[in-house]
A protein has these predicted regions:
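Active-site-proximal polar cores
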Residues: 379
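Catalytic beta-strand/loop signature of glycosyltransferases that borders the donor
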Residues: 382
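Extracytoplasmic/periplasmic solute-binding protein
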Residues: 204
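Extracytoplasmic/periplasmic ligand-capture domains
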Residues: 2, 6-14, 26, 35-38, ...
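Membrane-interface helix-loop-helix junctions at transmembrane boundaries of multi-pass membrane enzymes
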Residues: 19-20
Length: 420
């Protein structure tokens, strides 16, 4: 692979869980006009496709020609028992994997409880069925010796503002103040506690924990503070000029926010929280309701004013988040259409540096610029909860790869006692 310029994060991308080598002959034989071979997945990994029923089931079997890869060695004291059992074994450990595609959350959890699934990512809307308020397993799961693996996802949730929108966009002081006020008016702690059922926490900075560029000493995000939000609005002329109970723009025109949303019960909860919080500071908000793919099309065309999204990294590099604000990505990953010359220059410079203090300094400066202009309201870091039956061997939570199939095995001697 020959790069057009030094890009040290490329190695992390190539070694992430979503990257794999594909033989040139496969692309030549099965590739479509875009060079993809999605209908004929032939890779070079530890498993090969045995059976595929679209939208229902995937069966993988161990690749007999896979290169010799031993189980990785760990010096972590917490892994001693794991190392004693797995050290030196060749990957993949298990010969067959069945992936059952169950779209609805309730049937997924039921399948796990009945022992039809060996492990499960706990559906966010069913966390209360599995965990106690202190985030420990409920007694019936403990009785079945189910293990809980929990950690913060390498991701963020945020609400972006269209920087080209005549109401919320722009780089002047009063526009920055409006976006910052909207952020202070929104109660992320309530979102995390009520809507996300305690499975999230307020995000202090743009790059989440566990990812390069995260600085534990840096706090850039604003906290929920409706009183300060009101004062900031008053200071920059966002006041009620006609006595209708809603604030207006400094030039006297009505101030109305329009946020994208999807027609689901979960999205309605977010909409209600936004409506209630903004009403408390005198701002009117309306919702543009469309299916998610249609909202994405509108966003890429610059037709949405605001929209709430999430982003998750598959590698240890923080550029997956910074790239969402990089000017040349406007209309693609950069849905806010944020363009700031200093940010873009620092982004280009930092990409040419290896991970270290010099690059970390540039990434922190980019974060400071981001919070200075507030093209997003940064919301939360989310938690991952994986529940695993005792007959599954080798499971260790890796938030960058929550399905580590080659490293897992099944202990056939352990009695299968599902959740009652």
């Amino acid at each position: 692979i020959k790069l057009s310029y030094p890009s040290y994060d490329t190695l992390a991308d190539l070694t992430s869980s979503i990257s794999s080598a594909v033989a040139r002959e496969v692309i030549e034989a099965y590739g479509d006009a875009s060079g993809w071979a999605m209908a004929n997945p032939v890779g070079t990994g530890p498993y090969r496709l045995k059976e595929w029923r679209r939208g229902q089931k995937i069966v993988l079997e161990a690749n007999p020609t896979y290169r010799e890869v031993p189980y990785p060695v760990s010096d972590d004291p917490a892994d001693r028992a794991l190392m004693a059992k797995m050290k030196g074994r060749r990957l993949p450990l298990i010969g067959r994997i069945e992936v059952n595609i169950i779209e609805e959350a309730n049937p997924r959890l039921l399948a796990f409880e009945q022992g039809a699934l060996d492990y499960l990512e706990v559906p966010v809307d069913l966390v209360a069925n599995v965990l106690e308020p202190n985030n420990t397993l409920k007694p019936r799961f403990k009785a079945a010796n189910v293990a809980l693996h929990r950690g913060i996802q390498p991701g963020i949730t945020f609400t972006w503002f269209n920087m080209e929108d005549p109401v919320v966009g722009g780089y002047t002081k009063e526009k920055i103040a409006l976006r910052r006020e909207i952020g202070m008016a929104y109660n992320v702690d309530e979102e995390a506690k009520v809507i996300r059922q305690g499975q999230a926490e307020w995000a202090s900075q743009l790059i989440p924990p566990g990812v390069s560029g995260h600085d534990p000493s840096f706090i850039g995000n604003t906290k929920y503070d409706p009183a300060a939000a009101k004062a900031l609005l008053d200071r920059y002329g966002y006041v009620d000029r006609n006595g209708d109970g809603w604030r207006d723009l400094p030039d006297g025109r009505p101030l109305v926010l329009k946020k994208g949303t999807s027609p689901s019960a979960l999205e309605r909860q977010y909409d209600e929280l936004w409506s209630r919080n903004l009403k408390d500071v005198g701002i009117k908000i309306e919702f543009v309701t469309q299916k998610w793919p249609d909202l994405l099309k509108m966003a890429r065309l610059g037709q949405l004013q605001m929209w709430q999204l999430g982003n998750r990294s598959t590698s240890t590099e923080g550029y997956g988040f910074l790239g969402l604000l990089y000017g040349p990505n406007a209309g693609l990953g950069n849905l806010a259409r944020f363009r700031q010359a200093d940010f873009d220059r620092l982004y280009d410079e930092s990409k040419r540096l290896p991970d270290g203090p010099e690059r970390a300094k540039l990434m922190r400066r980019m974060s400071e610029i981001f919070f200075g202009y507030t093209p997003w309201k940064l919301n939360a870091y989310r938690y991952e909860n994986m529940i695993v039956y005792p007959w599954v061997e080798g499971y260790k939570l890796n938030v960058f790869n929550i399905h580590p199939w080659p490293y897992l095995d099944i202990d056939t001697k352990t009695a299968r006692k599902p959740v009652q």
